[in-house]
């Protein structure tokens, strides 16, 4: 991977910054320098974020959004890099709050990412690879064969993190080196063998589990479970076979007992059925005898009474119809007589009316000729009425046409006047219409103003604003610095005073300590006196107090040193702030002059529209008003065009209407002339009204005559029909009366004959009628017959049962039922026992079969498991004493090449032949994850030691050597990742002059075929490296980037 071009927008301190790595190809190494906090490491953060969505430090990607970014400013990073022969472009933006595209307020925009192959920087996209963060991350890992952490360990060495690869654990190193050197085939093979070993172990565990489950199955009773538990593993199969055979023997024994009990059940069932049948016969005999007593003997009197009454009913029943007919005929005969009398009376009245109507008809016949003559006159008048109506209709039409003609002439004059007005209006509007070229020119002028305003004035105004904001910020910082400097001076004076006081106390305590050590007769080491008069006043606590005071003096001295250093820094910062403030004021003045000149040119021709001095809001509003004014003028012009088109359309319509109305006037004259000629030709002068009145009078007389005649004829016809009907009805009633009298006489004779019979039960008509009409005849007859049948049946059934149970004793059914119940229960118990025994046999048989199957399969897989286990132990390091895995062994080979290259080209040179790398012999506590631990062999001590024991400068030298060697070895490896860039963030300040010079030589050596970038504040490196990227602070948290090529 080789960086080509990096663009940062509102990312950290970079508002719109670009790093073009193509400009840095002339020299093996380039330097990134700038003020502290200016954003040097942010360049590395941007590359890491673009590729992996993370930064080099602990900051989240969202926190990299510039603090000065507004809701309209979108944070994004665009990074171009080469991989092989292809140029890739990756664009990424973090989650951020941005202004809504529509309406007010903001919206949370999710993180985005896009990866594509392009033809050149800022060029055409050739292939779109991924368009979301997840897919982009997967594609980058596939392309580089590195994740973010591994990228930072071998390509990007962040600040204060050089020793991460050097001191990382074997698993971490192994993951990185496997990706770099493409040794995943060994990982895949190891994983496959591991999976097969795990699979085979799982299979064997399943075999053991299945066998154990079978031995501990719930089918075994506690005694059998105990036997299986105590038995040796190799004896358990034989024991299960023996237990199965025991169960078979128990089952056969229970089967024999069940068969014997089944025969007993059959025998007792036969005996029970016989006893039950005999008991039923005794019960039936008792029931039949009870029925005979209740239904035959006790009901015999009722039977005799019913028999006697039945004879009377049967005697009277044949006369039932005759009695009914006799009564109906007598009643009907009376009604017929009344009808005959009524018809005779009504017929006499109708005959008188018929004679009267006949005389009236003869009078009407004499008036008929006069009426017919009037009808003929009326017909002639009807023809005259039709002609008169035609004349009146034509006269009315003439009047209507004259009125319509008058209206038509009025409208014609009105349309002619409107036509003249329309022509006048059209002429006026044609003068008011503005050409389209006028508006095109006006819009171009307005757009040019907008372009000048947005493209020149606002950017210049923003420069003025930012400069003034920077001046305010610098003045505030200068003020804060002055306050802090004053406070620091006060603190320094206080610290000096306290320090001097503590020194006095120390002298006092040291004198006291010296006094305490003096011995009588020995000379004082200070004055040489042999007498020591004040030693008895020394306190024992002085020693402890002196120790504490010495600590306080040391702390006070450190504090004083810190304050002095801070005072120096504040003084330096004050000078820098004053210088920056002066420069900013000059810059602001220049920007204001530039803005003034540009604005004067801007309003030269538009002073009446825009304000005298630059005001962004007012200018924006003026431009908007100018746009609205132009739009309003254009709308009015469009409305005028529409009105003109409408008027021209109306003029054409009016011209057509004038023609139509002139033609209509001519047509009216022609129609009126035609109608007057037709009226003269008809020649009728009397009105239709008078003619209709004459005809109506004649027709009314004729209608009244015909109506009277018609009504008279109808009355004659009705009365004749009525008299005829009355004659027929009278004949019918007379015949009916004769028939009824004849039938009444016959029925009376029948009843009289019945009463005269010798066996007659009565001679009273009413009693006979009651018996004949009694509806209980059938019911009483059925009761009598049922009684006879029941009596005969019961006698036969009682006799039959008595014959069956003759000489037999009634059985004790309860005793037999109890015996039957006990026999059945014993049989059911034995059946259940047999089923249980059969189940136990089948279960034991199933267990035995399954055991044999599992053991057979286990024996079959034994050789396969042994081979896989041996292979797995070999590749996982379990078979060797060093416990080195196959994957680690392969990667260790590459690491040895890296260490050998580092020893030969870098570490010896940088450490003056003192150090060299070697692999650790074994891991701590013989752990499994070792094999890639790196030790440092010290030629001065003749012993190897851990990399953790190196100092800061030594650690940097060692880490740099490995990083450089790794880059070289990978470049020379066919399957390795192509590493065409190396970036180092700080660390050179810990090297002495000689080591620094050697490190520079090493960097230049590897920089011959790849890009090497260094961040450093070391002055020697600034002076030595010609190609530089300089990052300057601009105030307000902003920084800019400048490339320097020497």
From Swiss-Prot:
What top-level branch of life does the organism fall under?
Bacteria
Regions annotated as coiled coil: 223-239, 268-432, 468-505, 543-867
The function of this protein is: SbcCD cleaves DNA hairpin structures. These structures can inhibit DNA replication and are intermediates in certain DNA recombination reactions. The complex acts as a 3'->5' double strand exonuclease that can open hairpins. It also has a 5' single-strand endonuclease activity.
Tell me one GO molecular function of this protein. Answer: exonuclease activity
Quaternary structure annotation from Swiss-Prot or TrEMBL:
Heterodimer of SbcC and SbcD.
Gene that encodes it: sbcC
Q: What's the family?
A: Belongs to the SMC family. SbcC subfamily.
GO term, biological process aspect, one = DNA replication
Q: What are the binding positions for ATP in this chain?
A: 34-41
- Which Pfam families does the entry mention? AAA_23, SbcC_Walker_B
Protein name, UniProt field: Nuclease SbcCD subunit C
Keywords of this entry: ATP-binding, Coiled coil, DNA recombination, DNA replication, Endonuclease, Exonuclease, Hydrolase, Nuclease, Nucleotide-binding
């Amino acid at each position: 991977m080789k960086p080509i071009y990096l663009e940062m927008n509102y990312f950290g301190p970079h508002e719109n910054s670009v790093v073009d790595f193509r400009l840095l190809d002339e020299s093996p190494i380039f330097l990134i320098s700038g003020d502290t906090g200016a954003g040097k490491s942010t360049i590395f953060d941007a590359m890491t974020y673009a590729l992996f969505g993370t930064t080099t430090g602990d900051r989240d990607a969202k926190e990299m959004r510039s603090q000065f970014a507004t809701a309209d400013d979108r944070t994004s990073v665009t990074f171009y890099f080469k991989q092989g022969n292809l140029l890739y472009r990756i664009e990424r933006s973090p989650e951020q709050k941005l202004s809504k595209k529509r309406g007010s307020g903001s919206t949370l925009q999710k993180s985005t990412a896009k990866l594509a192959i392009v033809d050149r920087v800022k060029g055409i996209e050739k292939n779109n690879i991924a368009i979301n963060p997840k897919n982009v991350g997967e594609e980058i890992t596939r392309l580089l064969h590195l994740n973010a952490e591994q990228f930072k360990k071998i390509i990007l060495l962040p600040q204060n993190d050089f020793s991460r690869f050097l001191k990382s654990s074997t698993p971490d190193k192994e993951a990185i080196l496997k990706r770099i050197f493409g040794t995943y085939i060994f990982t895949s093979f190891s994983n496959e063998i591991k999976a097969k070993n795990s699979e085979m172990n799982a299979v064997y565990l399943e075999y053991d589990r299945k066998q154990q489950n079978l031995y501990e199955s719930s089918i075994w009773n506690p005694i059998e479970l105990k036997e299986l538990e105590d038995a040796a593993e190799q004896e358990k199969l034989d024991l299960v076979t023996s237990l199965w055979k025991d169960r078979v023997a128990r089952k056969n024994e229970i089967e024999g007992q069940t068969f014997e009990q089944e025969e007993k059940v059959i025998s007792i069932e036969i005996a029970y059925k016989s006893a039950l049948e005999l008991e039923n016969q005794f019960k039936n005999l008792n029931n039949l005898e009870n029925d005979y007593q209740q239904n035959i003997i006790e009901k015999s009197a009722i039977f005799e009474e019913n028999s006697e009454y039945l004879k009377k009913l049967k005697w009277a029943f044949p006369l039932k119809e005759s009695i009914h007919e006799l009564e109906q005929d007598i009643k009907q005969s009376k009604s017929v007589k009344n009808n005959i009398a009524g018809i005779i009376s009504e017929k006499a009245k109708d005959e008188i009316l018929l004679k009267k109507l006949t005389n009236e008809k003869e009078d009407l016949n004499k008036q008929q000729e006069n009426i017919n003559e009037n009808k003929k006159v009326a017909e002639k008048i009807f023809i005259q009425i039709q002609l008169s109506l035609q004349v009146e209709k034509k006269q009315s039409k003439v009047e209507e046409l004259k009125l319509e003609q008058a209206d038509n002439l009025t409208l014609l004059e009105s349309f002619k006047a409107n036509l003249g007005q329309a022509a006048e209006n059209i002429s006026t509007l044609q003068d008011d219409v503005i050409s389209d070229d006028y508006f095109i020119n006006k819009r171009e002028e307005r757009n040019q103003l907008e372009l000048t305003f947005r493209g020149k004035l606002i950017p210049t105004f923003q420069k003025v604003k930012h400069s003034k904001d920077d001046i305010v910020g610098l003045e505030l910082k200068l003020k804060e610095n002055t306050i802090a400097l004053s406070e620091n001076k006060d603190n320094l004076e206080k610290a000096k005073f306290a320090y001097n006081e503590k020194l006095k106390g120390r002298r006092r305590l040291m004198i006291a300590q010296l006094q305490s050590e003096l011995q009588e007769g020995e000379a004082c080491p200070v004055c040489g006196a042999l007498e020591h008069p004040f030693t008895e006043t020394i306190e024992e606590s002085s020693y402890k107090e002196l120790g504490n005071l010495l600590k306080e003096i040391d702390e006070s001295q450190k504090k004083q040193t810190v304050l002095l250093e801070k005072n120096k820094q504040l003084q330096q910062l004050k000078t820098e702030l004053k210088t920056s403030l002066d420069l900013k004021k000059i810059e602001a003045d220049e920007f204001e002059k530039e803005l003034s000149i540009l604005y004067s040119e801007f309003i030269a021709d538009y002073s009446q529209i825009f304000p005298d001095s630059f005001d962004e809001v007012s200018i924006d509003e003026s431009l908007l008003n100018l746009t609205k004014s132009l739009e309003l003028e254009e709308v009015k012009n469009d409305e005028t065009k529409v009105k003109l088109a409408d008027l021209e359309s109306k003029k054409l319509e009016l011209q057509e209407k004038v023609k139509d109305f002139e033609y209509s006037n001519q047509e009216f004259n022609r129609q009126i002339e035609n109608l007057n000629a037709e009226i003269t030709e008809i020649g009728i002068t009397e009105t239709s009204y008078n003619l209709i009145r004459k005809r109506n009078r004649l027709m009314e007389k004729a209608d009244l005559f015909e109506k009277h005649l018609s009504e008279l004829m109808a009355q004659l016809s009705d009365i004749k029909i009525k008299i005829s009907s009355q004659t027929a009805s009278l004949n019918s009633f007379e015949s009916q009366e004769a028939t009824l009298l004849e039938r009444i006489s016959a029925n009376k004779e029948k009843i009289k004959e019945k009463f005269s019979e010798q066996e007659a039960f009565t001679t009273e008509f009413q009693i006979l009628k009651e018996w004949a009409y009694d509806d209980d005849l059938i019911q009483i007859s059925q009761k009598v017959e049922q009684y006879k049948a029941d009596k005969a049946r019961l006698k036969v059934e009682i006799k039959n049962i008595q014959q069956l149970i003759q000489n037999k004793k009634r059985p004790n059914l309860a005793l037999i039922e109890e015996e039957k119940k006990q026999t059945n229960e014993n049989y059911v118990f034995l059946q259940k026992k047999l089923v249980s025994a059969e189940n136990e046999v089948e279960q034991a048989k199933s267990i035995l079969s399954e055991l044999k199957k599992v053991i057979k399969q286990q024996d079959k897989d034994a050789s396969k498991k042994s081979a896989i286990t041996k292979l797995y132990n070999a590749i996982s390091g379990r078979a060797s004493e060093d416990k080195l895995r196959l994957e680690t062994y392969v990667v260790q080979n590459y690491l040895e090449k890296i260490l050998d290259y580092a020893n030969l080209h870098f570490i010896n040179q940088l450490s003056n032949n003192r150090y060299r790398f070697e692999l650790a012999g074994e891991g701590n506590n013989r752990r499994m994850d070792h094999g890639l631990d790196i030790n440092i062999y010290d030629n001065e001590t003749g012993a190897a030691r851990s990399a953790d024991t190196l100092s800061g400068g030594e650690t940097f030298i060692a880490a740099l050597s490995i990083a450089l060697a790794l880059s070289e070895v990978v470049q020379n490896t066919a399957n390795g990742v192509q590493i065409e860039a190396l970036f180092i963030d700080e660390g050179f300040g810990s090297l002495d002059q000689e080591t620094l010079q050697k490190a520079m030589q090493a960097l230049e050596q590897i920089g011959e075929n790849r890009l090497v970038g260094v961040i450093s504040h070391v002055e020697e490196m600034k002076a030595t490296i010609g190609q530089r990227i300089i990052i300057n602070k601009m105030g307000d948290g902003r920084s800019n980037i400048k490339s320097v090529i020497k």
